[in-house]
Amino acid sequence: MTNNTKSITLNLGPQHPATHGVLRLILEMDGEVVNNADPHIGLLHRGTEKLIEHKTYLQAIPYFDRLDYVSPMCQEHAFALAAESLLECEIPRRAQFIRVLFSELTRILNHTLNIGSQALDVGATTPLLWLFEEREKIMEFYERVSGSRMHSNYFRPGGVAEDLPDGLLEDIDKFIQQFPPKLQDIENLLNENRLWKQRLVDIGVVSQKEAMDWGFSGPMLRGSGIAWDLRKSNPYDVYAEMDFEVPIGKNGDCYDRYLVRMLEMYESVKIIKQCIEKMPQGPVKTDDPKLTPPTRAKMKESMEAMIHHFKLYTEGYDVPAGEIYKAVEAPKGEFGVYLYSTGGNRPYRCRIKAPGFAHLQGLDFMSKGHLMADVITIIATLDIVFGEIDR
């Protein structure tokens, strides 16, 4: 008896809910076994890098919120650090603590969505519902600090837009007290679940060499056992003062990457707790008048202050000529911004390095030899968002 399987080509997406965006995947399969996976990108391309060249440094910030729209503040952070390096301005301590605090809240925001939607992709509904309750609380913190639940536009070259409103730190403290037990509930539900492990263990295995060769970063790299985290290896703002661990996996499969993301949330809680305990008093913006607009009280007294405010928001400020690359440890991996300034009020070039772009390239070799159903698991573990991939 012969076992002949038919070779088929399948278009997966871009309207499929499990592709996490507008991914079009062309799968070449023998029966249900995948031979090749060819991702087609560009369906969400908006020309972000070119648009930024026509905006002032202040007007460019909202574009970063719309790249990886699941973790917006981390991307603003990279751009702010790059602009600050060219400007050579001092950042107030309180602003640095606030930025680290919200970067870690953003990490939790990202990982809760990833783990919840990954569980949903393989057939578990409960984790998504539980984790979305926690995400809602963080989005309320976003709204209270910036006025927006998603596209916050909060970080600025020189600090942050506004100081924390009264009572917010206390509410964040309450949140991190009750959040770890909720994570423990998710772990009790998934970690030793037979079906969950069957769907994730030994699926999409990435060796240390492959992770390095393909330029992986974040949980995709640490899941393979490489302890590389920019918060430790190249600390920015006040990360050097924070006490936290870098979780790593050992097998490089989907299950290890899930565990790394779970453990990262516990570490984020530790960092947030330290930020709240050590939060200093003081200004949240640099005192350089070229970067910081005058207060409303000053504008009511002085015509020059009103003119200064108007010119700052219409013409922006000149950034000294030079080039810089700055990267942050975003929830998905290394998010980098390369800025080239010719001395004007607009960047001559702004190149964005998105971690998801490198991770999506690895989908082909990770999928080979797996079943069609496993491709869905691998897409989920890549944690891709097409805002940052297509830009």
Curated annotation (Swiss-Prot):
GO cellular component, one term: plasma membrane
EC numbers for this chain: 7.1.1.-
Leading EC class: translocase
Reaction equations catalysed: a quinone + NADH + 5 H(+)(in) = a quinol + NAD(+) + 4 H(+)(out)
Subcellular location: Cell inner membrane
UniProt-recorded Gene Ontology molecular function terms: NAD binding; NADH:ubiquinone reductase (non-electrogenic) activity; quinone binding
Topology within the bilayer: Peripheral membrane protein
Domain of life: Bacteria
Keywords: Cell inner membrane, Cell membrane, Membrane, NAD, Quinone, Translocase, Transport, Ubiquinone
A Pfam family that the UniProt record links to this protein: Complex1_49kDa
Similarity comment: family membership: Belongs to the complex I 49 kDa subunit family.
Subunit comment: NDH-1 is composed of 14 different subunits. Subunits NuoB, C, D, E, F, and G constitute the peripheral sector of the complex.
Function according to Swiss-Prot or TrEMBL: NDH-1 shuttles electrons from NADH, via FMN and iron-sulfur (Fe-S) centers, to quinones in the respiratory chain. The immediate electron acceptor for the enzyme in this species is believed to be ubiquinone. Couples the redox reaction to proton translocation (for every two electrons transferred, four hydrogen ions are translocated across the cytoplasmic membrane), and thus conserves the redox energy in a proton gradient.
Name of the protein in question: NADH-quinone oxidoreductase subunit D
Gene assigned in the entry: nuoD
